[in-house]
Amino acid sequence: MIRFVLFISCFFLIGTVVECNKDGYLMEGDGCKMGCLTRKASYCVDQCKEVGGKDGYCYAWLSCYCYNMPDSVEIWDSKNNKCGKGK
């Protein structure tokens, strides 16, 4: 019984430390989507992994889209679009 409780405790601890379930477009410092039109094929995959994501691709050769990123990563959102609005 003690082993079962320890197993469950470890399972929940691991789940709370690294939550990687966020998908979306990577965002540049100016609030715009991270472009990939003129980049090499692995650019988006590399950028996604750099922020802790599992995988990514260049969506329609325009913007980097990532899978399974940590919840702490800020992603582009059409509702809060700051692109081109200045800081």
UniProtKB/Swiss-Prot annotation:
Alphabetically ordered keywords of this record: Amidation, Disulfide bond, Ion channel impairing toxin, Neurotoxin, Secreted, Signal, Toxin, Voltage-gated sodium channel impairing toxin
One Pfam match: Toxin_3
Tissue note: Expressed by the venom gland.
Database matches in InterPro entries: LCN-type_CS_alpha_beta_dom (IPR044062), Scorpion_toxin-like (IPR003614), Scorpion_toxin-like_sf (IPR036574), Scorpion_toxinL (IPR018218), Scorpion_toxinL/defensin (IPR002061)
Record-listed Lysine amide modification sites: K85
Keyword Disulfide bond: yes
GO molecular function: sodium channel inhibitor activity; sodium channel regulator activity; toxin activity
GO CC annotation: extracellular region
One GO BP annotation of this record: defense response
Function: Alpha toxins bind voltage-independently at site-3 of sodium channels (Nav) and inhibit the inactivation of the activated channels, thereby blocking neuronal transmission. Affects the tetrodotoxin-sensitive sodium current permeability of F-11 rat neuroblastoma cells. Produces a dose dependent increase in amplitude and duration of the current.
Family, per entry: Belongs to the long (4 C-C) scorpion toxin superfamily. Sodium channel inhibitor family.
Protein name from the UniProt record: Alpha-toxin To2
Organism for this UniProt entry: Tityus obscurus (Amazonian scorpion)
